Amino acid sequence: STTGAAVSNAAVILSADKSTSGISALTDGRTDYTVYRNGVLSSVSALRKNDVVTYDAVSNTVYACDTRVTVYYESCEPSPSAPVSIKVLGGTQFDVLPTAQQSLSNFKPGKTMTLLLTSDGTVAGAVENDYSARGNAIGIVSGSKVQLLCGSTTIDLSLTGMTVDSKLDGKLVSISSSSKTSVGLYAKTGGVSGDLNVREGTLGSKKLASGVMLFDDGVLKNLSDLTDVSVPQSRISYARTNA
């Protein structure tokens, strides 16, 4: 898939905006690769500090993802010093890349940390919760279920023993956790403003990407699925750009 997850067992976390440092190690020196960022066709100029980059050699495609989620570290396998998988967010299991084990070894279960995720939802690194790499994870609530949006992938959260507020049904929410017994879900509002022109594929003055993710009452839809010619800003609860 040209918009999906990268096939890779290694990742690079960018140290600066528009940086290609470290990418050549993934691509074996090739520079003629295609770039996708958060599931959308992009370019090196759109890359940002702390983006996680992986590489699919078959399609010669670089995948960048900026999803960062602040979590309470619940458990891991087989050990905190070299975890291959961890559980966070109410028992949700995330696989850990070999290249991420060193940064994860700085944390032990019972602590909070911010995970940097690849475009397919694998852990590429872990950092302290600070301004330089603050969590930005968002998801969609559908009934009692919550899906974390990661690149062009959605990840079902386990939320074991937790109850989702029915008032959040169908809403886009921010996601974070600082304790074993709860996950913070807060409705997102605002963001990019403007009316959605379905026919022209624009939001205000901005052109929508072909792989734009749209949610209508919590259901993922394509732009072509919308029957309205336009959707006024008053009916759009939240929108953001890939930048």
Regions found by a protein language model. Name each.
Residues 1-243:
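...the same signal can extend to comparable exposed beta-sheet modules
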